[in-house]
Amino acid sequence: MSILQSFTFQELKNLLPNRAKDSHKGNFGKVLICAGSPGMGGAGILASEASLFCGSGLVTLVTDTSNVSSSLLRNPEVMITGVDMVEGVNIDLKIKDHNVILYGPG
């Protein structure tokens, strides 16, 4: 017996719940991603993009300031906070306000 199963995109779409017409991004999960050393923003960009693709409502990326421009160009719908990853920083991320936290991909 194989654990692999094939499906069509239409079959997958039928498994997803319908979103209410009066819903908004705050109804579909808040994701906080902390990623991206200076000049190494790819993992943060890809993680935030994957989060949006999976249906997350609100995605916030905290990354080094050198990665902010490229992150915004790739995914303007992601909220981005630039910090100095070398010096270290203490910012209020309001962790309790998020449903998912991804720390350090890449």
Region locations from a protein language model:
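Small-residue (G/A/S/T)-rich helix-start motifs and N-terminal tracts that mark the onset
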Residues: 1-106
